Amino acid sequence: MDAGLNRCPLQEHFLPRKNSKENLDRFIPNRSAMNFDYAHFALTEERKGKDQSATVSSPSKEAYRKQLAETMNLNHTRILAFRNKPQAPVELLPSNHSASLHQQPKSVKPRRYIPQTSERTLDAPDIVDDFYLNLLDWGSANVLAIALDHTVYLWDASTGSTSELVTIDEEKGPVTSINWAPDGRHVAVGLNNSEVQLWDSASNRQLRTLKGGHQSRVGSLAWNNHILTTGGMDGLIINNDVRIRSPIVETYRGHTQEVCGLKWSGSGQQLASGGNDNVVHIWDRSVASSNSTTQWLHRLEEHTSAVKALAWCPFQANLLATGGGGGDRTIKFWNTHTGACLNSVDTGSQVCSLLWSKNERELLSSHGFTQNQLTLWKYPSMVKMAELTGHTSRVLYMAQSPDGCTVASAAGDETLRFWNVFGVPETAKKAAPKAVAEPFSHVNRIR
């Protein structure tokens, strides 16, 4: 589909018109701004000069006249004034303080420009429109993986090339989740038949299949070094050590319905899980045991709808953001050390996904009905910085580029869009001040 034909170019910014009181169409003087005494003097001075031509003014009198005119500001006074003079600025500080302020101006960080439209759009036909699945991920090698029905495609952001990784058999599919390993080479693929396949993207070779742990589809995946955590419709969360023959090392039981969100913290010590039972669990890796069912560290029950959107803060330890579904519509912030809810913000619509900026104190959320938008928030004030529109269906999936600048979003409208929303970090600007932006100005098909 040629989505690019519907894109609107950047609108030219027009300056606002001046106040209508100043847009005068006739040259009618403003009487309140006129000095009638000086006007009479100026108009009659030349005639008086002719009548008194015999009288020769001395140099001292001429100098006195000029000095008097300068003092009274007569040389700069118009006879016909069409508007009032602007009011003189009020001196709020003593002159010595004012001078010091002019000598040391305060530096103000310019506001970052945030494009309101997507920079690139790829066609994503047959993407499964299911809130509980996770079908998009961007690996550390700058390759984006997306599952379209039974097929997994890889899009190389560095070259713009597209390749097919695997097409799953009908009896096993469709693909229900996908997640890159930290090395950016190996990718896990969750299936509708409860299996998880591990693939080498460099050689397009299947390495192994994990099965027997779940009884139904695997809708969420999360890597923690060599541990692959899987979440199923059966409510189970399983830690798999992919290095060993019998991979299951821990099983977490706490959700009563499908596990639709999984995220490990940056330290790898805590796991957040969200489910269709409206519950968020925090699990501690240090107390996990393979001998018995592991108890959660915190059980968070404040949401009133399914919790799929989970995001650990990159700049503040133990800070977790969670988003609720259509019956909840809130973003909540948690201290996972104490289990306390720090803040709750009503977004007005279903929260499908959350991403923290790696470079700024900002949070991006994707939403469903009615606007199907991406909203950028300033943290911790939670003031809206921008709303990005373009999708015509709920924005179910988001993924962030390795450099943290670009976000990819996929929706039920069968489009994959790229947004330059988070900006370039200051370190990258200093290292490459003349970097050329990627040519995100046309539309390609992903297959």
Curated annotation (Swiss-Prot):
SMART domains assigned: WD40 (SM00320)
Q: InterPro entries, per this entry? A: Cdc20/Fizzy, WD40/YVTN_repeat-like_dom_sf, WD40_CDC20-Fz, WD40_repeat_CS, WD40_repeat_dom_sf, WD40_rpt
Compartments, record wording: Nucleus
Q: Which GO terms describe its molecular function?
A: anaphase-promoting complex binding; kinase binding; ubiquitin-protein transferase activator activity
The keyword Cell division is assigned to this record: yes
Q: In which tissues is it expressed?
A: Expressed in meristems and organ primordia. Present in flowers, leaves, stems and roots.
Q: Name one Pfam family in it.
A: WD40_CDC20-Fz
Please describe what this protein does: Component of the anaphase promoting complex/cyclosome (APC/C), a cell cycle-regulated E3 ubiquitin-protein ligase complex that controls progression through mitosis and the G1 phase of the cell cycle.
Give the family, as the similarity comment puts it.
Answer: Belongs to the WD repeat CDC20/Fizzy family.
Report the protein name in the record: Cell division cycle 20.2, cofactor of APC complex
Name the gene. CDC20-2
